[in-house]
């Protein structure tokens, strides 16, 4: 089951885990990985589940993008911390975008790629259980997936 243990953790704890995991992994496949500078803050949620959510978003960015660029941008607004994963080479169409958080849904770009169609659906369930949100947009051939965390 998708249980979450709500507590408080620092944004830097979350980002350090993500950077440690992906710096080497992405350099091995020659993907440029960039994490923007950010102001540390306390977040409300489940640290391990938050790591899972970001890993899932990044794995999708690698699988369905062109593998050239993964950028993570961080911003704060309205008492929330936004973490946006941007990837180049988005092959999803605008008409498919509204469906990416549905269970078992897979885009036309997923034909030769392994997956269950559950990743982003689970991410959304987890973000909602932590009081947050997740959304996506396509701009100029880039895919942006943003996880919204509640600040303490």
Predicted feature locations:
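Short helix-loop "hinge" at the ATP-lid/N-box region of the Bergerat-fold HATPase_c
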Residues: 61-62
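A conserved beta-strand-to-alpha-helix junction within the catalytic ATP-binding
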Residues: 5-20
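Short alpha-helical Gxxx[C/S/T] motif in the catalytic ATP-binding
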Residues: 119, 123
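Short conserved segment of the HATPase_c
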Residues: 92-105
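Conserved catalytic submotifs in the C-terminal HATPase_c
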Residues: 5-8, 32-42
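Short beta-strand/loop element within the Bergerat-fold HATPase_c
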Residues: 69-79
């Amino acid at each position: 089951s998708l249980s979450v243990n709500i507590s408080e953790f620092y944004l830097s704890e979350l980002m350090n885990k993500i950077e440690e995991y992906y710096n080497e992994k992405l350099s091995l496949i020659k993907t440029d990985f960039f994490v923007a500078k950010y102001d540390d803050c306390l977040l409300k949620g489940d640290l391990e589940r938050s790591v899972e959510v970001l890993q899932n978003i990044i794995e999708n960015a690698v699988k369905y993008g062109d593998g050239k660029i993964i950028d993570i941008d961080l911003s704060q607004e309205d008492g929330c911390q936004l973490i946006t994963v941007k990837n180049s080479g988005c092959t999803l169409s605008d008409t498919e975008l509204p469906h990416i958080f549905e269970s078992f849904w897979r885009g036309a770009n997923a034909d030769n790629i392994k997956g269950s169609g559950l990743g982003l659906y689970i991410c959304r369930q987890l973000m909602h259980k932590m009081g947050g949100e997740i959304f996506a947009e396509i701009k100029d051939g880039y895919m942006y997936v943003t996880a919204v965390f509640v600040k303490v």
